[in-house]
């Protein structure tokens, strides 16, 4: 971190060079690090907070922690942005589009502050870990009151208190990751599905990815804390948990015990939770023991998100992905052969620097072979500070858009085809709530969205649903 004096205090700014470092220092497991001082427990009394979350499931779960911390300080949540006394943007740094959305929303906050100047505005999450972003906020968005990073969530009470006392911008961003904190509170968004962090950070350093810089080095939680958390969720009536990490397949490799992701999956399955999911997976670390664990346990869902990124060996090497097209397809076939009815989805980037038409056709070839149930597709977005951002971006915007269109056309074809196999079949669906059109909605074990006709009494239950119609990205059905 870099100290910066603003005249009356010291700001802790992010430093990309520091964020690249990976120390050999042991990560400590701390069970009493988070605390709200007595004099801060009523700091938010009579005040409302609003959180807007961008990005991945890890960010969603971070926001659940932030909400609980704020409520420990007597703030109450509001869904109405204009009514809030505290507005926090929990940001994503993975693509430029996410940046633009955040700065666009900040414009709305600035306008609101003109009529309600007492409002506190904060930026947190992965964008707060980016040196260039924080410098821009410091120089051009002086009305943003607080900025804190992914490693500073536990210190929100003190950051807020300083800002409210000093009436000036407070920035606290640690570039080097902290220890694993086991006593952060959580206010879960759902009563039926829960996110459970099993690890933090990533050491893969794919050349296009900013996450290893914004989330720090890999740190696994100890198994006992994860299992105890899931047991408590079972006691509280939860039906489904998702084990979260930037690369869950690498879980345990930093622990000084012989305990890996396959072991964790088996132990979590023993808790009796109805449904277990995990994300995100890196093909490099997806071993046979993980596949066996999924196959052996009915409550581990037959759904795997397996990012491809590119089907070209040349581009995969430039991306630093550590596998070849052949190795990826070998893993894909193992999953299909060993896990009945498995649904596999993926991520694909088009227009990476150096991608030729031949490279792109290699990607289409893999999509044609794998026939994914779904795919998240993106045009390459250079992130400041990553090796790929310095590569010669020799693919024209026209070529990028043409390739994305062609890829999406193929992805849509296979998504629709994958859904066809559900028509007139009965499948189990966890009903999660009421959709925009007034019908119930939920997900199959294979992560298919289903719009369901039925009574609200079924919310929170796993029910049998007959699929009556299929669309490209969803299914329609009725409870039987």
Give residue ranges: language-model regions:
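Terminal RNA-binding accessory module
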Residues: 11-19, 35, 390-480
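Structural recognition of alpha->loop->beta junctions
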Residues: 138-153, 262-273, 296-301, 362-374
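Conserved, mostly hydrophobic/aromatic
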Residues: 206, 226, 243, 278, ...
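Conserved SAM/AdoMet-binding glycine-rich loop
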Residues: 118-123, 130-132, 235-357, 368
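A structural motif corresponding to the C-terminal lobe/cap of the Radical SAM core domain
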Residues: 299-302, 314-430, 440, 461
């Amino acid at each position: 971190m870099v100290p910066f004096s603003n005249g009356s205090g010291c700001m802790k700014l992010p430093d990309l060079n520091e964020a690249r470092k990976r120390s050999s220092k042991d990560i400590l497991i701390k069970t009493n690090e988070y605390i709200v001082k007595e004099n801060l427990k009523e700091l938010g009394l009579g005040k409302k907070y609003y959180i807007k979350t961008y990005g991945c499931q890890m960010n969603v779960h971070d926001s659940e922690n932030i909400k609980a911390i704020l409520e420990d300080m007597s703030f109450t949540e509001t869904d109405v942005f204009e009514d809030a006394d505290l507005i926090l943007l929990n940001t994503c740094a993975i693509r430029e589009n996410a940046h633009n959305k955040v700065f666009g929303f900040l414009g709305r906050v600035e306008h609101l502050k003109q009529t309600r100047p007492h409002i506190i505005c904060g930026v947190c999450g992965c964008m707060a870990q980016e040196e260039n972003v924080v410098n821009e906020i410091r120089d051009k968005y002086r009305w943003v009151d607080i900025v804190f990073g992914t490693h500073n969530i536990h210190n929100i009470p003190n950051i807020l208190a300083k800002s409210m006392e000093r009436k000036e911008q407070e920035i606290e961003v640690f570039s080097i990751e902290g220890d694993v904190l086991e006593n952060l509170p959580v206010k879960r968004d759902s009563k039926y599905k829960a996110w459970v962090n099993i690890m933090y950070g990533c050491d893969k350093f794919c050349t296009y990815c900013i996450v290893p810089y914004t989330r720090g080095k890999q740190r696994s939680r100890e198994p006992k804390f994860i299992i105890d958390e899931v047991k408590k969720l079972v006691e509280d009536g939860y039906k489904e948990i998702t084990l979260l990490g930037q690369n869950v397949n690498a879980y345990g490799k930093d622990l000084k015990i012989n305990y890996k992701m396959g072991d964790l999956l088996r132990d979590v399955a023993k808790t009796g939770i109805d449904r277990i999911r995990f994300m995100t997976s890196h093909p490099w670390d997806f071993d046979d023991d993980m596949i066996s664990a999924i196959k052996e346990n009915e409550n581990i869902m037959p759904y795997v998100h397996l990012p491809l990124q590119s089907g070209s060996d040349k581009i995969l090497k430039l991306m630093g992905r550590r596998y070849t097209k052949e190795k990826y397809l070998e893993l894909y076939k193992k999953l299909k052969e060993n896990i009945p009815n498995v649904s596999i989805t993926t991520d694909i980037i088009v227009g990476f620097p150096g991608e030729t038409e031949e490279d792109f056709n290699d990607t289409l070839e893999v999509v044609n072979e794998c026939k994914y149930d779904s795919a998240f597709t993106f045009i390459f977005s250079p992130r400041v500070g990553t090796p790929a951002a310095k590569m010669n971006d020799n693919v024209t915007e026209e070529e990028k858009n043409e390739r994305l269109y062609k890829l999406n056309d193929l992805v849509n074809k296979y998504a629709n085809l994958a859904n066809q196999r559900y028509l007139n079949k009965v499948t189990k669906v966890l009903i999660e709530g009421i959709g925009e059109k007034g019908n119930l909605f939920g997900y199959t074990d294979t992560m298919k969205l289903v719009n369901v006709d039925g009574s609200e009494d079924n919310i929170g239950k796993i029910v049998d649903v007959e699929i009556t119609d299929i669309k490209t990205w969803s299914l329609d059905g009725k409870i039987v």
